[in-house]
Each structure stands twice: as C-alpha cells, then as structure tokens.
Design a protein with these regions (language model features):
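Catalytic alpha/beta active-site cores
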Residues: 1-97, 101, 119-122, 128-130, ...
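Conserved phosphate/anionic-ligand binding catalytic regions in large, soluble enzymes, centered on
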Residues: 146-168
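Catalytic core of soluble alpha/beta enzymes
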Residues: 115
Length: 169
C-alpha cells in the first residue's frame, strides 16, 4: 500500500488511512517504516453498538479501555506516546438522538484526552483522536424517505460532535 501511494505521488504526510490491524498484532517492525506517515492509523477500536443510545455510553467506556490497553501495548513495543496516539482511531456507532450523540462524541474526545494525559505526551495534539462515526441502521424499517431523514440527522450529530470521518452504509 505504501509503495503504491508513493508510485502515485501521494506525499507521506497526506496519506490518511486506518489499516485495521488485529489488536494483538506485533507491529514493532512497522515502527520505523511508519515514521514518515503520521496519518496512518494501525488500529480501529469500535464501540460495536447499533442505535441504542442508552447502551452506547457503556460501550464508549469499553472503547476507551480498549484504547488505553492498545496505547500501553504500542508503548511497550517501542512507540513514543505521541506516535502511539496517532496510530489509533475510534469507530463510534450513532443512534437517533441528535443531541445525545453529538454530546457523546464530544465527551468521548474529552475522556480520551484524560486517558492520554496519564501517559504524559510531549505534544498537545496527542490528546486529539480520530473518530470515525458510523450511522446506524434503523431498527424499524420505515419509508425510504424516513430512513434518509434519520441518516441525515445522525450525520449532522456526528459532524456537530466533531468526527473526522463519517460512514453511511
């Protein structure tokens, strides 16, 4: 993938992708190679919840715990705190409550900053995290117009909440 991007003239700093590597993978051999690619994320941590806002808060805290464990794992493998933070992304699924979901994404971002603070990063930008918001499938299948409206509202809540990427299946 990296060779292909170089062949096509993509600057290393412009290549932004998440590889989605399994969480238990040994990526220590990739550390030096990825040094010039600051926007390549290795791991995606998902809250795996579809459309139930009441339960989503608990799943968000589980995602934070998984992120903290992966951060520790990367540091043990020799990554700096700052580089390890840049190699993670969170995939958060959205529900139908516009305001709750926007607030949840913002709260998640703040909670992650507190987790990162424990590791004492050198750069403040390490407190930020990539959030890939995912529009949830409706539990009740209505008319196509209703589903378009629901997806649009979820997308608005994701953007308002500060996501970096948005997946609309």
């Amino acid at each position: 993938l990296l060779e292909r991007a170089e062949e096509q003239g993509v600057a290393p700093a412009d290549l932004s992708i998440c590889l989605g590597i399994p969480h238990d993978a040994d990526v220590s051999d990739m550390k030096d190679r990825l040094a010039k690619y600051p926007r390549i994320r290795l791991f995606s941590i998902s809250d795996r919840i579809l459309g139930n806002s009441e339960v989503a808060i608990g799943h968000s805290s589980e995602a934070l715990e998984q992120g903290k464990a992966l951060l520790s794992h990367l540091i043990v493998l020799g990554f700096s705190v700052d580089d390890a933070c840049a190699r993670l992304q969170f995939r958060l699924h959205l529900g139908d409550d516009l305001f709750l979901e926007a607030a949840r994404l913002r709260a998640f971002r703040e909670a992650w900053a507190k987790v990162v603070d424990e590791f004492k990063p050198e750069h403040d930008c390490s407190h930020n995290t990539w959030i890939q918001a995912v529009v949830g499938y409706p539990e009740i299948v209505g008319s196509p117009h209703e589903n378009v409206i629901r997806d649009t509202l979820q997308a608005i809540s994701a953007i308002t909440g500060g996501c970096h990427g948005l997946t609309i299946p």
